[in-house]
Amino acid sequence: MPQTPSVLSCVFVTVFTLTGSMLAQEIVAHRGASHDAPENTLAAFRLAWEQGADAIEGDFRLTADGQVVCLHDADTRRVTGGEADWKVSEVTLAKLRTLDVGKWKREAFTGERIPTLAEVLAIIPPGKKLFLEIKGGPELVKPIRRVLVSSGISPQQIVIIAFDQNTVVEVRRLLPEVKVYWLVSYKQDKETGCWTPTADEVFQTLSRIRPHGLDTEANPEVVNRSFVDRLRREGYEFHVWTIDDGARARLFRDLGVDSITTNRPALIRQELQKPEVKQRNVGQERQ
């Protein structure tokens, strides 16, 4: 009797793969574990270590008396819940230290003070890093260098980041043993839909100022596979900020990013440990 033609049935098999780069990304806690604790405080930085961060990121400015302190904004209004609106550059460290910068987040953090760079350096565990963002210009590099040298911290534990291009150049000149990354963000033209700076403009700047790496806004419209491949060809490290979403984090993981800056280090580490999911058709012959 004739053989019944075989019927090819197609089933979807979910294949889980752990990519080689999946666990390679460093987790950088943006202003500390700032989703859960008041940003840029010792409480937020300590919590970041507890949540498994590889590095903390903090913003640093100069006071009127030349002290390097950790604060994002140029004034104190937001982190005091509006109780004090002082320009950091116009007041002394002693006056800034009278402010409570914790209770605006939660009562449990009442009493947190604006920390100095020296205090932040003192709580960095061995093997962990500080991404030190310079809020200002090249004039901050020498004061920061003095604090770093006096602290005795290893240069390998410090990464300096800055939007200001002249600051990047000054760091390369005065702190050649410390890595420096250029920070970049993008704006979209409402009429044309184009993003600026363009990829070509980014690479022109990199070629001119020669940082060790690029710390870029996590914008997949600009930062795509060809962008990353070019970064690697030209010898730059590849870092992104600020991601609190698991899907976005995995997208950049799969592009081979070196570090992800996040407000939620524990969550993003958990999300990055999820395997990459691929689907393929597997034919099964049934007689």
PLM region spans:
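Positively charged n-region of N-terminal signal peptides that target proteins for export
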Residues: 1-9
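Bacterial N-terminal signal peptides
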Residues: 9-20
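Phosphate-group recognition and catalysis centered on beta-loop-alpha active-site segments
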Residues: 20-287
